[in-house]
Amino acid sequence: MCFQTKLSISWVPLFLLLSRVFSTETDKPSAQDSRGRGSSGQLADLLQVLSAGDHPPHNHSRSLIKTLLEKTGCPRRRNGMQGDCHLCFEPDALLLIAGGNFEDQLREEVVQRVSLLLLYYIIHQEEICSSKLNMSNKEYKFYLHSLLSLRQDEDSSFLSQNETEDILAFTRQYFDTSQSQCMETKTLQKKSGIVSSEGANENTLPQLAATIITLSLQGVCLGQGNLPSPDYFTEYIFSSLNRTHTLRLSELDQLLNTLWTRSTCIKKDKIHQLQRKQNSIITPDQDYSNFSSSMDEESEDGPISWDQTCFSARQLVEIFLQKSLSPISKEDFKQMSPGIIQQLLSCSCHLPKDQQAKLPPTTLEKYGYSTVAVTLLTLGSMLGTALVLFHSCEENYRLILQLFVGLAVGTLSGDALLHLIPQVLGLHKQEAPEFGHFHESKGHIWKLLGLIGGIHGFFLIEKCFILLVSPNDKKSPEDSQAAEMPIGSMTAPNRKCKVISLLAIMILVGDSLHNFADGLAIGAAFSSSSESGVTTTIAILCHEIPHEMGDFAVLLSSGLSMKTAILMNFISSLTAFIGLYIGLSVSADPCVQDWIFTVTAGMFLYLSLVEMPPEMTHVQTQRPWMMFLLQNFGLILGWLSLLLLAIYEQNIKK
């Protein structure tokens, strides 16, 4: 009995071992099956997209590629509209380059390669469709390496983060997907099976291409959008605790302690300094290194760092609920809770105004604010009709005109030197004032202010020399400008209608082109930020008032009636709206904005330092010292207003 018991007990471990072996062997096919299902996932997703609204296509290579090419290459059909579709290359050529056969079923590898070719087509569509680039005479490797070396200054063995963002920018524009909420690049790479921090390589880039094409056909926005996805907030919270999927009870306790003790919102770059001064603020339970690392990683993802963005209540509702007017229920509040916790955790809304990362202006803000600005500019330019009040007093007209000329010189040169040029050179982006060190971050403003002081100093020397030394008995040739034309001659009858008409036409054409350039500059400024739009509008408005007053005087002196001159002046000012909407449409790219700002700064400097100073130095009047004071008052007022805007522009509410 004892022997049998020992024998039976000795068989138990052997039985368990054999069971383990058999279970392992039986598990292997299931694992292989799961991998097989994963490898065919992109093909299944693509078939589902291609069959949307139609009969499911048979898995036939030629027909599927043709359907895919039509949906990708024909925007009108892709958006559900009817119209002719002219493909820039044949589906058969696309299939052959990808290594597929006409009659066989479409394989996963071929789908991925075709997707990569379609990405290349989207990026180089203009060259391909204009016959400058022929896709049929190149091998697949050529297109693969072309995408990997999209940026010449980066490693051509991997598709870097910047190159991926470039491709996604092309696809967003090509497929015209909504940019309110976008799938982030890291999520897209993870969905494509890319785990390397360096990005996709030769083997994984086709998988990434297939995911991009499939999601884009589904209308999913990819890359950097105007608002983050709802998942971002939860990922931020988990990454701050060095967790990925689950939280332990101790980590939840750590999160609560952090929220309770971060009421003062100490930023990571101030922790070490404040530890010496305020030891009571930081408790032993807090670990700020996690927050620092997560902030650093996220800030490198793209041009906008969501970690330092203070979202409004309306923006949080738009992110999580996709609605703005409905009441927020308890279930809605549960969905929004990660966003609220993330805002408390990141302390974004407690940062100084000039350190908060601001969202780019929305389309409604850009078009709304800029339209109001140009409308005010048009109404301001009509102040030239105020000349009617000074028909009987030419001297008062000259004094008022010189006040506005000085104001125009101050605002134009101030906007160019204190705002536009620093923005083009990237000096605004470096502004991150440290507490108690305001003068260090604004150093370039004080240096440029010294430059303006030099301009003003030499103007004073020249003006005083003219007032004290030069005889005042003869006008210089420059005194024959429109601004000094006798008011009494404005209504004089025409002597030569043809010449007068030609002069009026020249004035109107010049005004129209000038207003068009002003509108272009305002459009680019409001595309950059509301602050830039305000400063540029103020500068242009101060310049337009004396400019239009002078032109209005010329129109009256050319023989036009008062009503006709007002109407012509108003019509020429409407070209500013044309320039505005062109500027808004072409300046979405920051690079285009910089070039428009560069040309605008040059135009402002020319007007303020070349065209207008002769009016200020050589104008004749019976009260020269009064004019001298008014000119300097206008200059100082213009420069002072732009200086205050340059210092406090970050505090202007959007």
From Swiss-Prot:
- Which ranges sit in the Cytoplasmic compartment? 229-369, 420-448, 523-565, 611-626
Q: Motif XEXPHE-motif: which residue numbers?
A: 543-548
Keywords from the named record? Ion transport, Membrane, Transmembrane, Transmembrane helix, Transport, Zinc, Zinc transport
Q: Where are the transmembrane segments?
A: 208-228, 370-390, 399-419, 449-469, 502-522, 566-586, 590-610, 627-647
Q: Which Pfam families match?
A: EF-hand_Zip, Zip, ZIP4_domain
Catalytic reaction annotation: Zn(2+)(in) = Zn(2+)(out)
Q: Where does the record place it?
A: Membrane
In this UniProt entry, which residues form the Extracellular topological domain(s)?
A: 1-207, 391-398, 470-501, 587-589, 648-654
GO terms in the biological process aspect are: intracellular monoatomic cation homeostasis; neural tube formation; neuron projection extension; zinc ion import across plasma membrane
Q: How does it sit in the membrane?
A: Multi-pass membrane protein
> What does UniProt give as GO cellular component?
plasma membrane
The GO terms describing molecular function are: monoatomic cation:bicarbonate symporter activity; zinc ion transmembrane transporter activity
Matching entries from InterPro entries are given as: ZIP, ZIP4_12_EF-hand, ZIP4_N, ZIP_Transporter
Can you tell me which family this protein belongs to? Belongs to the ZIP transporter (TC 2.A.5) family.
Q: What does this protein do?
A: Uniporter that promotes Zn(2+) import from the extracellular space to the cytoplasm across the cell membrane. The transport activity is temperature dependent. May play a role in neurulation and neurite extension. May play a key role in maintaining intracellular zinc content at levels that reduce the inhibitory effects of rises in oxidative stress on spermatogonia and spermatozoa viability during spermatogenesis.
Query: Under which name does UniProt file this protein?
Result: Zinc transporter ZIP12
Supply the source organism for this entry.
Macaca fascicularis (Crab-eating macaque)
